[in-house]
Amino acid sequence: MMKKNHRQLHIIYNIAALLGLLSFAACKTPQATLPKDTIKASLPVATSDTVSAIPVWRDFFQDETLRALIDTALNNNQDLKITLQEMAIAKSNILAKRGQMLPSITANMSVGASKVGRYTADGAGNVGTQITPGHNIPTVTPDIAPSLQLNWTIDLWNQLNSDKRAAVERYLASEDGQRTLKSQLVADVAENYYSLLALDNKLDIMLQYIKLQQKAVQIARVQKEADADTQLAVEKFEAELAKASAEEYELRQAITETENNLNMLLGRYPTPILRNKENLMNKQVPTSLQTIPTSLLLKRPDVVQAEHQLEAAKWDVDVARKAFLPSLNVSASLGLDAFNPKYLLHLPKSLAFGVIGGLAAPIINKKAIQANFDQANALQLEALYNYDKVLLSAYSDMTTLQAKAHNLAQYQALKVKQADALSKAVIAAQQLYTYNRATYLEVLDSEREQLDCQVELVDTQLRQLSTLIDLYRGLFSLQG
């Protein structure tokens, strides 16, 4: 008998040793190599200014009407509301990952009955056996068992912790995504508002030009009646008047479209927007804000968002790598068990419990685990390249817009000189035409050139403001 027991123990030890060796073999995990981020390392170092250069949008935009519109957009915009729900989802995912690290405890209530065959080991053994003093085991035996069940996957290798960290990074990325969208919304509202003011100014210029052409038609008719000019001159001025009148309605349509686009950003149905067109041309474009240190690029929400996504991908690789390691699961139960409810509280006789632990390690056919690891590694590289792309794009946009801001300032100064000269030329041409010393073509050309120059001045002012807004798109502080 002792030899038999010894042989059984020997077999058990051999099996345990084999399982131990197999588990050790299964502990070999692949290593992911992430290349050095040369793009971030080679980012030009800032030589001036500090983070305090980020403008608060309320200070940046002095127009009270625009401030009110931005406030409305930040409160009502549907895209922002969608991102809030995405953040809530990401936050819930953190709680779910955190919950996976803790043991789960469930309450169970089991009620049943069983009957075993008479000619079985259990059936034969139960014959004459008393379940309580003076009472044999009934043929049909009830079973009532309230209990608590515990299941726990012990995080031996911090795999679950890595999964939670990935969820945290994704939540932070969603926060920065919302900051990016908010800053984008501020910029979009401002650009649409200034575009609307620019169209108002263009319409005002066009209406003045139409009045000028109406007067020119009258003068041409007087000149023709006095035989100082021909019918051709009258028709040319009338054609120019018709052309200007058509452009008026084109501008009115553009105003309607821009106003509706702005209302869409505000999260409301088309509503007239009260505004003062003078707020565009009177707006001073601050040149001191046209230089942004490159260090601020690393603090842009879109760049920080891409960085959090990269960190999340790194943790995902760690989770996939640790899937090659053995996992330890513990299950336990504690409860009461009796054939009759009145015996449930007869402690400790009615007490029932059990504990079991299991160590599981992948040994054969790891293709699925390897595929998950390869996928996580590829996604990590993709996140790195996306981060580099966002950073390169931010820097490229910044340098382009800084040059654009400088060149537009020079362009506008020259356009102002051109407008002054053309204004004098129009007056001179009109006077000369009245005295029959200039042709109608010279008058038309000078008036059309003046119109084009005035429109270009409005466009230049708008482009300067849009350029400055684009420079700080993604950098606006949302305080205040």
How would you name each of these model-derived features?
Residues 2-75, 252-295, 341, 473-480:
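Terminal intrinsically disordered/low-complexity segments used for targeting and assembly
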Residues 27-41, 74-155, 257-273, 292-371, ...:
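A small-residue-enriched
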